[in-house]
């Protein structure tokens, strides 16, 4: 995967020299996130590359292609290289370390953005669907872009996703060979819902340099929260960072 991403970066670099349609930014952020699993909180210093060349784009772990792009509507097909969750038994709390490792999946998806100009030109409705070898997700999001000042933007959002039976069972179910310690029963959940809300803000120091901050929260329905290996709580993801736009 690392070699593949480096290849993509090299291709985009060549494109940047050859064509003015190339756009790029790099974000370095520090964030903290509570885990859905019964384990330690996860900390990280992620680097988010963002590149676009005509209709082709790379955004974090997502590589996509826009095949419709109009003023009020655009759609894209994409591949997410890091969809899902990744957890090892060694990261779990005492009594729950017998679980097998859960791994990210590579998912292919479709996404569309509809500007709801009848309500506000800054309001966007986003339906999506993605599927990988470990299951599928269907989502619907609503976001609003508000320019507080010329150099300050704020964007609140809400979304709901349905995670398929296969997806939910792989990441949150419990098989017989995982029993041990505090895990005493198998668990085979049906599909579940994920409800989310977020707030993103960005302050531009210059045309190229900006600071950003974000907070995201999500809650799962009972199919996930009743799992022996998960926590019944609101999952939060809070962070801040700097972005450089080329």
Residue ranges and their predicted role:
Residues 19-66, 166:
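Short glycine/proline- and aromatic-enriched beta-strand/turn motifs that initiate or cap beta-hairpins
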Residues 24-32, 51, 62, 77-83, ...:
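Transmembrane beta-barrel strands of outer-membrane/channel proteins
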Residues 25, 46-48, 74, 107-109, ...:
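Membrane-embedded beta-strand positions in outer-membrane beta-barrel channels/transporters
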Residues 35-39, 58-60, 84-90, 121, ...:
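Outer-membrane beta-barrel proteins
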Residues 46-50, 203, 233-246:
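Outer-membrane beta-barrel "beta-signal"
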Residues 55-58, 73, 118-123, 151-154, ...:
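Repeated loop/turn-to-beta-strand initiation elements of outer-membrane beta-barrel proteins
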Residues 129-131, 135-139, 143-212, 217-224, ...:
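Outer-membrane beta-barrel transmembrane domain signature
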């Amino acid at each position: 995967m690392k070699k593949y991403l480096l290849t993509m970066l090299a291709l985009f670099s060549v494109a940047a020299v050859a064509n003015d349609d190339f756009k790029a930014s790099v974000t370095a952020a520090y964030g903290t996130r509570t885990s859905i699993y019964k384990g330690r909180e996860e900390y990280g210093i992620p680097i988010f590359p963002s590149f676009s060349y005509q209709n082709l784009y790379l955004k974090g772990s997502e590589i996509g292609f826009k095949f419709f792009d109009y003023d009020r509507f655009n759609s894209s097909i994409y591949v997410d290289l890091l969809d899902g969750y990744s957890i090892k038994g060694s990261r779990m709390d005492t009594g729950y370390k017998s679980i097998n490792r859960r791994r990210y999946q590579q998912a292919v998806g479709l996404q569309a953005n509809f500007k709801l100009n009848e309500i506000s030109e800054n309001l966007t409705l986003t339906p999506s669907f993605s599927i990988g070898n470990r299951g599928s997700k269907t989502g619907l999001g609503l976001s609003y872009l508000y320019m507080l000042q010329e150099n300050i933007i704020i964007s609140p959002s809400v979304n709901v996703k349905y995670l398929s039976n296969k997806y939910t069972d792989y990441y949150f179910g419990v098989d017989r060979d995982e029993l041990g310690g505090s895990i005493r029963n198998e668990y085979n959940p049906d599909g579940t819902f994920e409800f989310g809300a977020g707030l993103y803000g960005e302050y531009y120091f210059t045309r190229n340099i900006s600071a950003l901050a974000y907070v995201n929260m999500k809650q799962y329905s009972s199919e996930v929260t009743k799992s022996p290996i998960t926590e019944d709580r609101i999952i939060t993801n809070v962070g801040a960072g700097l972005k450089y736009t080329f």
